[in-house]
Amino acid sequence: MTAHGLCRMAEVSGTEALWLLESAVQGRLVYVQREQPVLRPAVHVLTYGRLVVRTPAQAAALSARTSLTYQADEIEVAGGTGWTVTATGPAEVITDPDEAAHYRRTLPGWAHGPHDTLVRIHPQTVIGFRLARAEAVR
């Protein structure tokens, strides 16, 4: 007897998780505000081991956070394959005008003005999983 459509998640190394994260262009910034989880769509780039994220969130909401979480994934629902990576670490809002201008030129954004924020996350915890078809069960 063969079971079709079974998938399994396998944890990957931190190095592979960072490689997967580097291959993605968008994800979600996650933080807590008023005791509620907040998720914002975001784009990112991994530079010198730091994650630079552009997100439509107010800088004031993020600057009070000492740690932020970023999650990205690529899932092929029909094929039952893909991956997910979560990175958490200390973070700061990018305030240097030249650095901010550089990332605003290179990272596409959805919002402008007070809801267009750049943050740098120093990943300390990186966890990744691959989703794959399980071998046939007999």
Positions of predicted regions on the chain:
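Extreme N-terminal tail/first-helix region
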Residues: 1-21
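A short, compositionally biased
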Residues: 22-26, 64-65
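Short beta-strand segments
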Residues: 24-56
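Short, surface-exposed beta-strand-loop junctions and turns on beta-sheet-rich folds
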Residues: 35, 59-61, 135
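General beta-strand recognition
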Residues: 50-52, 120, 127
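Short, structured beta-strand-loop surface elements
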Residues: 56-117, 123
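Short helix/loop capping segments that flank catalytic or ligand/cofactor-binding pockets
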Residues: 129-131
